[in-house]
Amino acid sequence: MSSVLAAYEQFLQTTEDRSFGDQQFVQSDTLKAEIPVFVLNTNDPQQRFTLMNFCLRLAVSSSAKSAIKQGALLSLLSLQATSMQNHLMIAARAPDAALRIIEVDAIDPQDYTLTINPRSGWDDIKIRAYRALSRDLPISLADRTVFVSRDAEHAVCDDMDTYLNRIFSVLIQIWIMVCKCMTAYDQPTGSEERRLAKYKQQGRMLEKYQLQTDARKIIQLVIRESMVIRQFLVQEMLTADKVGAYTNRYYAMVGDIAKYIANVGMSAFFLTLKFGLGNRWKPLALAAFSGELVKLKSFMSLYRRLGDRSRYLALLESPELMEFAPANYPLLFSYAMGVGSVQDPLIRNYQFGRNFLNTSYFQYGVETAMKHQGTVDPKLALELGITDEDRVDIMQSVEKHISGKAGDDISQPAGAFTMSLSRSAFINNNTSQDFSGARLSNYEQGWSGTNQDETRDVYPESTMHRLQNIEPTDSDHNELLMPELESDSNPFNRPRFTVRAPLIPEISHQNPTTRMNRNINTRDNTRADHQDTNEDRGSNVPDDILGDLDN
């Protein structure tokens, strides 16, 4: 039997094996769209700044085609390089790339008229057409500019330091839009604004050159549609990762943003490893988990074999990304999400409610995490020299801080699959009575926790006996406030607000039928009093007001 299990494990690992770069398999070339990219032959800061604005306008233009927008973005991503043409050769190596280099000798800052080098073969018609494209901005952009600040586009740029601050401010925003371009590009999560605020605080981004929200969204869609741009960006991130700590300003920025982009689309896999395997709890020995544990082992081996590009499978649209989908290990995924919902409050932001989520194993993960809140790892405790007394003290301290919390505390399971915890109720409802045909008042519903259709009549015990002890001879009994609830050793039985008593304390001794009759009589008496008052004031009050009172 052991040989069969070993063969099964080897079989699963073999199914995940991939052989890359086999020379006997040559892919056929496909048709490619020509992508025009602009290369400036000068390092003048004003000319580069003007070309930056021109490329931004082309990238968000309403009438520009997709290939023109992609070429504008590639030119924009190369404006920080000393030699733009050499930097663009990184993108030229992409299988779908068909770049056409357009050499620009000069560009007019006023109307973005290009002066093209004769080697590029452009005529005046194309120059006028591209100038018209740069003017055709979406109507959603305010002030006919891509920037939030109206005067940012036409500011003077007469030194290199000013230009670098501006181009890096724009490039940071483009890289931020890469983070969610392939996963949740249409879901506003707030992470984009937080990252913008971070780089503003660090001084890497000038607020004056912040792009408008609609402009950033258009740029994000261009990146999402272009495999050439995404392959170029992946190569830039790999370069930033390999150069080390001593690097230039641009690659330091790319390396920082790459931390947000790495392993995008693989959150389920890494969260399962973190909360399912990382804790090393005993439920992993369940027989139901054995097959999925072997699968996870083969997936980890596949991830290592993919090398550096394994972190960017979503950007590269790699088919290996499907191997790491949580549907391949649903039980371990459900258990890990239950554990994570207790241990990490950030799991609330992760949409783990899939159709293959097993609610039983999710609840089991929640129970396991709750039970292990104060436990100590025996191996680490032995390393640290923790005694039995220290272990008990640690467990009691953790339990004291966790058990005394409620609401949105970290110990509450997150998500739609919650479970009832072993805690005392806010109000003790063990003394409920059923009355047919009676409708509870709002006051009674507030204490009983029922809606208007239910017929339970429940009062807190500590208040009931106080109301019953009120003497009927007390002339001020109608103005008494409800006594405060008695102190309870259980913190969850304490009231969260002060409640006033009804104006008639004897209401607690009346059954619902008596209360209903009393309300009817009170309503009739009130109506009669209004009629008597109207008759007395009839000669002094206008007719229209009398009509309102009669109704």
Swiss-Prot record:
Organism lineage string: Viruses, Riboviria, Orthornavirae, Negarnaviricota, Haploviricotina
Function description: Forms the helical nucleocapsid (NC), protecting the genome from nucleases. The encapsidated genomic RNA serves as template for transcription and replication; encapsidation by N is coupled to RNA synthesis. Forms the encapsidation complex with the phosphoprotein protein P. Before encapsidation, the newly synthesized free N protein, so-called N0, is chaperoned by P.
Organism (species): Human parainfluenza 4b virus (strain 68-333) (HPIV-4b)
Family: Belongs to the paramyxoviruses nucleocapsid family.
Record remark on domains: Ncore is globular and carries the regions required for self-assembly and RNA-binding. Ntail is an intrinsically disordered monomeric domain in the C-terminus.
Gene: N
Region described as Ntail: 405-551
Alphabetized Pfam families for the sequence: Paramyxo_ncap
GO cellular-component term (any): viral nucleocapsid
Keywords: Capsid protein, Helical capsid protein, Host cytoplasm, Ribonucleoprotein, RNA-binding, Viral nucleoprotein, Virion
A GO term, aspect molecular function: structural molecule activity
Database matches in InterPro entries: Paramyx_ncap
Region described as Ncore: 1-404
Membrane spanning stretches: none
Biased composition (Polar residues): 509-523
Record has Nucleotide-binding as a keyword: no
Record flagged with keyword Methyltransferase: no
Protein name: Nucleoprotein
Basic and acidic residues bias (residue ranges): 524-538
Ranges where the record places region Disordered: 509-551
Residues noted as binding RNA in the record, renumbered to the chain: K180, R195, Y260, Y350, R354
Entry's localization field: Virion; Host cytoplasm
